């Protein structure tokens, strides 16, 4: 992911742990305390997110619109290359998901 700042934020960054990074995929575990964020980034590959815990997320989009998303633990979703956003833990509990990028 390439990061580029869109809006000023006082939030702290989540923890990211690279699990796999090879010629075919990149797998990263993201761990958030409440109100932590990924920071602004653009996805350079198609990707799949699998929620490890329930994930109550606020997604900040480049157009200034925010989207609230709740993903149940164990559920997954897929997105295409080029998505630009900042992901924030909008809940009161820690949240964790695994991102699988397909190179």
Task: Show the residue positions of the predicted features.
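A short, N-terminal "cap"/entry segment at the start of jelly-roll beta-barrel domains
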Residues: 1-29, 33-34, 40, 61, ...
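Short, surface-exposed coil-to-beta transition loops
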Residues: 44, 82-83
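Glycine- and acidic-residue-biased ligand/ion/polar-headgroup-sensing regions
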Residues: 44-63
